[in-house]
C-alpha cells in the first residue's frame, strides 16, 4: 500500500496548478524514495519532470512501486476542495484503480474524503541526460514570470542572451520590440532577490513565450527560478520545492529559420 501525508498540503495544490494547463494526464511513479512524474506536454513540445522525495512528506509509506495514471484536470478539481491550511493524505492500495485524497482541517474539526479514478496510461520514459550548461541564471521567480508576461504583449518568442555581466530578454513583433536587461547583483541582503549568473560561454537562444508562460505557473512553489542554457539543447527552467524536491521544465530552442513562421 501507498500512503503519504503532507502537513503543508498547499504544496500539492501548487504543484497541480503548475502542471494542469500543460499536461492533461500523466503517470505518477511511486516508490520508496518518493513520487516522480515525467511527461511531455499535450503538444509534445516541452517536457516536465517532478520529484517529491519521500523524506519531504511528514509520513510516507510505499510497500511496492506503483505507476498511477492520473487525469491532472480531475486531480486539480479535487485539490481545489482542500483549504490552503489543510493536511493532505494520499492513499492507494497496491493494485487499486482509485487514489484516495483526505483533507484535514488544522483544527481537526473537518475531514474531507475524496476518491479519484485512476487511468491506464501507456507511458514511455525519456532519458534526460545530465549535462553541463554554458550559462546558468538564478533569479527571483516573480521577476521571471513578469518578464515573460510583459514580453508576450510584444511578440511570440523571446531571445535570451546571457553574458557575464547580465542577462537580456528581447522580443519583437508587429508593434515594435522590447528589451529587458537584468544585471548580476553583487550585494543583496535577501538571497531570493539576487540575480546570479554562472557562465562558461555566452549564449543567445530563442524560445516560445507561450510555453514559458505555462512554466511560470510554478512561481508560487519557489521564490527563485534557475534557467540553464546551452546552444542546441533544451532550456531547463527549475523551481525548487523546499525540503522536498523540484519541478523542472525542458523546452527546446526555436531554430533561427523558424522565426518567420
UniProtKB/Swiss-Prot annotation:
Post-translational modification: Phosphorylated. Phosphorylation at Tyr-211 by EGFR stabilizes chromatin-associated PCNA.
GO biological process, one term: replication fork processing
UniProt keyword annotation of Iron-sulfur present: no
Crosslink feature (Glycyl lysine isopeptide (Lys-Gly) (interchain with G-Cter in ubiquitin)) location: 164
Transmembrane segments: none
CDD domains to which the protein is assigned, alphabetical: PCNA
Molecular function as annotated in GO: chromatin binding; damaged DNA binding; dinucleotide insertion or deletion binding; DNA polymerase binding; DNA polymerase processivity factor activity; enzyme binding; histone acetyltransferase binding; identical protein binding
Sites bearing Phosphotyrosine, chain numbering: 211
Cross-link Glycyl lysine isopeptide (Lys-Gly) (interchain with G-Cter in SUMO2): where in chain: 164, 254
InterPro entries for the chain: DNA_clamp_sf, Pr_cel_nuc_antig, Pr_cel_nuc_antig_C, Pr_cel_nuc_antig_CS, Pr_cel_nuc_antig_N
Location relative to the cell: Nucleus
Residue ranges the UniProt entry marks as DNA-binding: 61-80
Residue numbers carrying N6-acetyllysine: 14, 77, 80, 248
Region described as Interaction with NUDT15: spans on this chain: 7-100
Gene Ontology CC: centrosome; chromatin; chromosome, telomeric region; cyclin-dependent protein kinase holoenzyme complex; extracellular exosome; male germ cell nucleus; nuclear body; nuclear lamina
Outcome when changing residue 250 to A: Complete loss of interaction with UHRF2
Keywords: Acetylation, Deafness, Disease variant, Disulfide bond, DNA damage, DNA repair, DNA replication, DNA-binding, Dwarfism, Host-virus interaction, Isopeptide bond, Methylation, Neurodegeneration, Nucleus, Phosphoprotein, Ubl conjugation
Keyword Thylakoid listed: no
Disease connection: Ataxia-telangiectasia-like disorder 2: A neurodegenerative disorder due to defects in DNA excision repair. ATLD2 is characterized by developmental delay, ataxia, sensorineural hearing loss, short stature, cutaneous and ocular telangiectasia, and photosensitivity.
Function (record text): Auxiliary protein of DNA polymerase delta and epsilon, is involved in the control of eukaryotic DNA replication by increasing the polymerase's processibility during elongation of the leading strand. Induces a robust stimulatory effect on the 3'-5' exonuclease and 3'-phosphodiesterase, but not apurinic-apyrimidinic (AP) endonuclease, APEX2 activities. Has to be loaded onto DNA in order to be able to stimulate APEX2.
Further comment found in the protein's record: Antibodies against PCNA are present in sera from patients with systemic lupus erythematosus.
Entry similarity comment: Belongs to the PCNA family.
Subunit and interaction comment: Homotrimer. Interacts with p300/EP300; the interaction occurs on chromatin in UV-irradiated damaged cells. Interacts with CREBBP (via transactivation domain and C-terminus); the interaction occurs on chromatin in UV-irradiated damaged cells. Directly interacts with POLD1, POLD3 and POLD4 subunits of the DNA polymerase delta complex, POLD3 being the major interacting partner; the interaction with POLD3 is inhibited by CDKN1A/p21(CIP1). Forms a complex with activator 1 heteropentamer in the presence of ATP. Interacts with EXO1, POLH, POLK, DNMT1, ERCC5, FEN1, CDC6 and POLDIP2.
Name the UniProt record assigns to this protein: Proliferating cell nuclear antigen
Annotated organism of origin: Homo sapiens (Human)
Amino acid at each position: 500500500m501507498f500512503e503519504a501525508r503532507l502537513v503543508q498540503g498547499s504544496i500539492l495544490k501548487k504543484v497541480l496548478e503548475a502542471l494542469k494547463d500543460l499536461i492533461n494526464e500523466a503517470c505518477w511513479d511511486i516508490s520508496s524514495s518518493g513520487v516522480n512524474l515525467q511527461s511531455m506536454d499535450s503538444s509534445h513540445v516541452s517536457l516536465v519532470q517532478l520529484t517529491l522525495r519521500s523524506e519531504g512528506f511528514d509520513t510516507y509509506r510505499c510497500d511496492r512501486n506503483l505507476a498511477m495514471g492520473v487525469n491532472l484536470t480531475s486531480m486539480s478539481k479535487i485539490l481545489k476542495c482542500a483549504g490552503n491550511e489543510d493536511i493532505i493524505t494520499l492513499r492507494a492500495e497496491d493494485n487499486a484503480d482509485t487514489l484516495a485524497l483526505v483533507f484535514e482541517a488544522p483544527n481537526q474539526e473537518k475531514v474531507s474524503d475524496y476518491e479519484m479514478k485512476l487511468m491506464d496510461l501507456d507511458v514511455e520514459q525519456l532519458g534526460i541526460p545530465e549535462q553541463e550548461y554554458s550559462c546558468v541564471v538564478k533569479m527571483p521567480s516573480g521577476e521571471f514570470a513578469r518578464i515573460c508576461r510583459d514580453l508576450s504583449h510584444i511578440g511570440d518568442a523571446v531571445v535570451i542572451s546571457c553574458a557575464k555581466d547580465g542577462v537580456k530578454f528581447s522580443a519583437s513583433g508587429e508593434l515594435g520590440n522590447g528589451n529587458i536587461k537584468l544585471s548580476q547583483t553583487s550585494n543583496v541582503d535577501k538571497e531570493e532577490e539576487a540575480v546570479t549568473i554562472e557562465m562558461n560561454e555566452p549564449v543567445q537562444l530563442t524560445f516560445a513565450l507561450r510555453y514559458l508562460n505555462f512554466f511560470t505557473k510554478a512561481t508560487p512553489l519557489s521564490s527563485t527560478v534557475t534557467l540553464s542554457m546551452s546552444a542546441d539543447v533544451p532550456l531547463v527552467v527549475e523551481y525548487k520545492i523546499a525540503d522536498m524536491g523540484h519541478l523542472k521544465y525542458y523546452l527546446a530552442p526555436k531554430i533561427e529559420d523558424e522565426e518567420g513562421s
